[in-house]
Amino acid sequence: MLRAKHIGKNYSSSLSPVLSPEHKPSLLESQAIGTVATAQANFMRVIVQDVANSVTSDDDNDSSKTGVELLCVVRAVLKKIRRRVLVGDKVLVGSIDWVDRRGMIENVFHRRSEILDPPVANVDHLLVLFSLDQPKLEPFTLTRFLVEAESTRIPLTLALNKTELISEEELETWKIRLRGWNYEPLFCSVGTKDGLDDIAFVLRDQTSVIVGPSGVGKSSLINVLRSNHGGGVVEDENWFEPMLGNKWFDDQRVGEVSSRSGRGKHTTRNVSLLPVSEGGYLADTPGFNQPSLLKVTKHSLAHCFPEIRNMIESEKCGFRDCLHIGEPGCVVKGDWERYPYYLQLLDEIRIREEFQLRTFGTKREDDVRYKVGDMGVKHAEPRLMPKKHRRESRKKTKQTMISELDEFEDEDSDLYIENDPIVQAIENENKRQ
């Protein structure tokens, strides 16, 4: 009984709130702290960064454990409380088999940043990459990606690839147009290697995510930045011990733009965090055509447009919750290029919020609940869905069984009476009379 109680306490303590980045838990020999490098299906590849003191007491053991790549699964209780593990997360790994390089993710450290499209954690910088042609640059699609990037509050850089496919006049037109959007884009060409120095300087010593539609050259840019442009990965920088078949030191697969649709083909299937020779990491992400904008609300949308931010910086609107659609005292006028895009996105978000309000209401419960245990110590446990994880009470189960047995006995007795020859003879005699 005491052993079961002790196990229960350990189970609850492991469900404590997300670990603080400054906090270093005491590690066992079968535990380690690492970073999630890639996620595919139900498996995570984690790069070990810190191990227990008993393991690192020997220099040989230290070098053999730090930098090892582990193939991990996520603890089931984390899935129950919807504590999602993302690429880029700093995690606590337990139950490690150092021979087979396998383990289980037990907890997640607090994230300093997070993005949804694509799902990556602890991002320092966003590189929004589009192509000027093949596929052709569409202003509304570009606006949608920029709004999604602005909503994360993470520093971003806009880069336009494939400059060799358009004329100088078109290039100058896009420069002037994007400056009107309050952006200073970087122009580059992966094919001719033009403009890559500026991009490499911006991405240096940071964890950066490259986002954009399929076919704009994200994987090609990563291949150039990791190999040809940077001169290759130096031998001393190979402190990782990757597994066979991973993507850490291989070129990313690239594909051609479809000649029929004019759009790119999906060659990258999952998010991967890749080291760069000049320092930092790059996240290669699957291309998608439309960001979801799930974290953008009707009130936060305006702050995702630099034009509106500049208008309301010096003079405020008459109402705090102004949506800038012609309200009295609104300082935002409709004489700027992307105002129709703002109205279109605002209508989309308002329809989504009204649907969510009708469907889910306003009450939302946390995925974790806390109970006060011995000595007033709080323990966390998952808040499970009542109809999915809760079992029925024994009293209700017994009542259901009794009622089912009664119905069965009634049916059985009726069947027995119908087949009884004496009863049938009496019924026939009554019919003759």
Curated annotation (Swiss-Prot):
<dbReference type="InterPro" id="IPR027417">
    <property type="entry name" value="P-loop_NTPase"/>
</dbReference>
<dbReference type="GO" id="GO:0009658">
    <property type="term" value="P:chloroplast organization"/>
</dbReference>
<dbReference type="Pfam" id="PF03193">
    <property type="entry name" value="RsgA_GTPase"/>
</dbReference>
<keyword id="KW-0547">Nucleotide-binding</keyword>
<dbReference type="GO" id="GO:0005739">
    <property type="term" value="C:mitochondrion"/>
</dbReference>
<feature type="binding site">
    <location>
        <position position="324"/>
    </location>
    <ligand>
        <name>Zn(2+)</name>
    </ligand>
</feature>
<feature type="region of interest" description="Disordered">
    <location>
        <begin position="1"/>
        <end position="20"/>
    </location>
</feature>
<dbReference type="InterPro" id="IPR030378">
    <property type="entry name" value="G_CP_dom"/>
</dbReference>
<dbReference type="InterPro" id="IPR012340">
    <property type="entry name" value="NA-bd_OB-fold"/>
</dbReference>
<feature type="binding site">
    <location>
        <position position="317"/>
    </location>
    <ligand>
        <name>Zn(2+)</name>
    </ligand>
</feature>
<dbReference type="InterPro" id="IPR004881">
    <property type="entry name" value="Ribosome_biogen_GTPase_RsgA"/>
</dbReference>
<feature type="domain" description="CP-type G">
    <location>
        <begin position="113"/>
        <end position="291"/>
    </location>
</feature>
<comment type="subunit">
    <text>Monomer. Associates with 30S ribosomal subunit, binds 16S rRNA.</text>
</comment>
<keyword id="KW-0342">GTP-binding</keyword>
<keyword id="KW-0496">Mitochondrion</keyword>
<keyword id="KW-0378">Hydrolase</keyword>
<protein>
    <recommendedName>
        <fullName>Small ribosomal subunit biogenesis GTPase RsgA 1, mitochondrial</fullName>
        <ecNumber>3.6.1.-</ecNumber>
    </recommendedName>
</protein>
<dbReference type="InterPro" id="IPR010914">
    <property type="entry name" value="RsgA_GTPase_dom"/>
</dbReference>
<keyword id="KW-0690">Ribosome biogenesis</keyword>
<dbReference type="GO" id="GO:0005525">
    <property type="term" value="F:GTP binding"/>
</dbReference>
<feature type="binding site">
    <location>
        <position position="322"/>
    </location>
    <ligand>
        <name>Zn(2+)</name>
    </ligand>
</feature>
<comment type="function">
    <text>One of several proteins that assist in the late maturation steps of the functional core of the 30S ribosomal subunit. Helps release RbfA from mature subunits. May play a role in the assembly of ribosomal proteins into the subunit. Circularly permuted GTPase that catalyzes slow GTP hydrolysis, GTPase activity is stimulated by the 30S ribosomal subunit. Required for embryo development.</text>
</comment>
<keyword id="KW-0809">Transit peptide</keyword>
<keyword id="KW-0699">rRNA-binding</keyword>
<keyword id="KW-0479">Metal-binding</keyword>
<dbReference type="GO" id="GO:0019843">
    <property type="term" value="F:rRNA binding"/>
</dbReference>
<keyword id="KW-0862">Zinc</keyword>
<dbReference type="GO" id="GO:0042254">
    <property type="term" value="P:ribosome biogenesis"/>
</dbReference>
<dbReference type="GO" id="GO:0046872">
    <property type="term" value="F:metal ion binding"/>
</dbReference>
<keyword id="KW-0694">RNA-binding</keyword>
<feature type="binding site">
    <location>
        <position position="330"/>
    </location>
    <ligand>
        <name>Zn(2+)</name>
    </ligand>
</feature>
<feature type="binding site">
    <location>
        <begin position="212"/>
        <end position="220"/>
    </location>
    <ligand>
        <name>GTP</name>
    </ligand>
</feature>
<comment type="similarity">
    <text>Belongs to the TRAFAC class YlqF/YawG GTPase family. RsgA subfamily.</text>
</comment>
<dbReference type="GO" id="GO:0003924">
    <property type="term" value="F:GTPase activity"/>
</dbReference>
